């Protein structure tokens, strides 16, 4: 039997870190013994636990320890991180450490270094002479890069549950359900957005990004989101060809997928409107030219151009067109999405499972994340794929956006 002590510190009960350590140890066929356990009595008090983890072999124990580090366990008397150079571009040394999306530090030459730009499913590349470390996706690893291997010298810090009563992310920290009070949730989201916008206006940092699908337009939520962009609540939009195309279709023809937005009735010949919209943008050259020439006079994309809000439109094999602004190289789109979202304070994901999962994979866990979808399974899938910090609002996205705008405008009047 091979054994190693681990430590857990912080709000390890409220944040379910202790429970996760117990569960993962047993799931992997290991065992544990609690050596010390000091529970904080007050809300501001942290807890501490020391556990003895055991495995059948050293390799088995190492596997368990790596999993436990990913949920926040620390190994006392940690050795320096083990580094090995990559022998080829995009080829990693055996035993490389695969990252989580949580803030991470590595111990190099007896000093702890914060790993820049945390994201899941990447590797840690260390620059010892510069006392610097960063995550890199496998395709960006170059020959000679020092890649972290094993589990020594790594400290992972998952986000803890908020201890402040009434905060959105404390209020929502429970199972995904369609039976939660929508009005109360929307008010708390609006309050959080208002605070983030005010901070952004003062500092120019942070802000809110939207990850949006075409259902925003189909359900009639487009004008509400466009107004939020105009009011300065949105600092970036990440979407695909469909959102932009149907937003432009709505602006030019008053339809989405050929259905009248106001009456919800199909329009004769409306099935061609989205192709007409693509053609109009192709003729203008791009969305910006369409706005400046007066072809496009309203909508989400119009407000992005008018208010200088960056957007990243990532292409898909399903796309019609696509419009000229769409990035058809998926790796280029991925890089631009990550750059755009990394510094944001909040990301709101609106009715687009695949784009939400893709964005969640690119960003650190400390970014506040809200996922809105009429299907509870969408939020569950997002969390199961690693974006565990996301809170879910199960509702129609069009209704959500209209009510959210109403609450934001109410907060505007109180200023």
Curated annotation (Swiss-Prot):
<comment type="function">
    <text>Catalyzes the conversion of ornithine to proline, with the release of ammonia.</text>
</comment>
<feature type="binding site">
    <location>
        <position position="355"/>
    </location>
    <ligand>
        <name>NAD(+)</name>
    </ligand>
</feature>
<feature type="binding site">
    <location>
        <position position="373"/>
    </location>
    <ligand>
        <name>NAD(+)</name>
    </ligand>
</feature>
<feature type="binding site">
    <location>
        <position position="242"/>
    </location>
    <ligand>
        <name>NAD(+)</name>
    </ligand>
</feature>
<dbReference type="Pfam" id="PF21570">
    <property type="entry name" value="ArgZ-like_C_2nd"/>
</dbReference>
<dbReference type="InterPro" id="IPR005239">
    <property type="entry name" value="ArgZ/ArgE-like"/>
</dbReference>
<dbReference type="Pfam" id="PF04455">
    <property type="entry name" value="Saccharop_dh_N"/>
</dbReference>
<feature type="binding site">
    <location>
        <position position="320"/>
    </location>
    <ligand>
        <name>NAD(+)</name>
    </ligand>
</feature>
<dbReference type="InterPro" id="IPR007545">
    <property type="entry name" value="LOR/SDH_bifunc_enz_cons_dom"/>
</dbReference>
<comment type="similarity">
    <text>Belongs to the AgrE/ArgZ ornithine cyclodeaminase family.</text>
</comment>
<feature type="binding site">
    <location>
        <position position="354"/>
    </location>
    <ligand>
        <name>NAD(+)</name>
    </ligand>
</feature>
<feature type="binding site">
    <location>
        <position position="396"/>
    </location>
    <ligand>
        <name>NAD(+)</name>
    </ligand>
</feature>
<feature type="binding site">
    <location>
        <position position="241"/>
    </location>
    <ligand>
        <name>NAD(+)</name>
    </ligand>
</feature>
<feature type="binding site">
    <location>
        <position position="352"/>
    </location>
    <ligand>
        <name>NAD(+)</name>
    </ligand>
</feature>
<keyword id="KW-0547">Nucleotide-binding</keyword>
<dbReference type="InterPro" id="IPR048964">
    <property type="entry name" value="ArgZ/ArgE-like_C_1st"/>
</dbReference>
<dbReference type="InterPro" id="IPR048963">
    <property type="entry name" value="ArgZ/ArgE-like_C_2nd"/>
</dbReference>
<dbReference type="Pfam" id="PF21571">
    <property type="entry name" value="ArgZ-like_C_1st"/>
</dbReference>
<feature type="binding site">
    <location>
        <position position="397"/>
    </location>
    <ligand>
        <name>NAD(+)</name>
    </ligand>
</feature>
<keyword id="KW-0456">Lyase</keyword>
<keyword id="KW-0520">NAD</keyword>
<protein>
    <recommendedName>
        <fullName>Ornithine cyclodeaminase</fullName>
        <ecNumber>4.3.1.12</ecNumber>
    </recommendedName>
</protein>
């Amino acid at each position: 039997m091979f054994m190693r002590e681990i430590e857990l510190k912080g709000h390890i009960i409220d944040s379910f870190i202790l429970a996760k350590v117990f569960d993962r140890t047993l799931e992997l066929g290991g065992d544990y013994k609690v050596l010390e356990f000091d529970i904080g009595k007050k809300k501001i008090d942290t807890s501490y636990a020391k556990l003895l983890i055991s495995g059948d072999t050293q390799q088995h124990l190492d596997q368990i320890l790596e999993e436990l580090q990913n949920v926040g366990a620390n190994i006392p008397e940690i050795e320096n991180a083990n580094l090995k150079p990559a022998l080829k571009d995009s080829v990693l040394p055996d035993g490389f450490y695969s990252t989580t999306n949580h803030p991470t530090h590595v111990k190099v030459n007896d000093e702890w270094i914060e790993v820049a730009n945390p994201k899941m499913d990447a590797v840690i590349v260390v620059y010892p002479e510069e006392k610097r470390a960063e995550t890199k996706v496998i395709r960006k690893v170059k020959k000679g890069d020092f890649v972290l291997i094993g589990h020594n010298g790594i400290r992972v810090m998952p986000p803890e549950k908020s201890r402040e009563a009434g905060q959105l992310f404390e209020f929502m920290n429970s199972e995904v359900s369609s039976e939660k009070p929508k009005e109360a949730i929307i008010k708390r989201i609006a309050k959080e957005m208002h605070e983030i916008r005010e901070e952004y206006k003062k500092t120019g940092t942070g802000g809110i990004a939207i990850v949006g699908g075409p259902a925003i337009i189909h359900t009639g939520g487009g004008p509400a989101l466009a107004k939020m962009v105009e009011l300065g609540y949105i600092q970036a939009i990440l979407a695909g060809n469909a959102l932009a195309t149907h937003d432009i279709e709505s602006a030019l023809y008053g339809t989405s997928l050929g259905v009248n937005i106001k009456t919800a009735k199909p329009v004769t010949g409306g099935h061609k409107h989205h192709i007409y919209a693509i053609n109009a943008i192709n003729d203008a050259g791009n969305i910006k030219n369409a706005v400046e020439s007066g072809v496009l006079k309203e909508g989400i994309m119009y407000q992005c151009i008018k208010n200088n809000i960056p957007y990243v439109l990532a292409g898909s094999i399903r796309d019609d067109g696509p419009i000229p602004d769409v990035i058809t190289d998926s790796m280029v789109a991925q890089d631009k999405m990550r750059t755009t979202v990394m510094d944001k304070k909040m990301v709101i994901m609106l009715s687009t499972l695949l784009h939400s999962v893709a964005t969640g994979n690119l960003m650190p866990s400390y970014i506040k994340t809200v996922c809105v979808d009429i299907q509870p399974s969408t939020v569950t899938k997002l969390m199961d794929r690693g974006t565990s910090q996301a809170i879910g609002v199960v509702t129609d996205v069009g209704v959500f956006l209209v009510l959210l705008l109403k609450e934001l405008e109410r907060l505007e009047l109180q200023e």
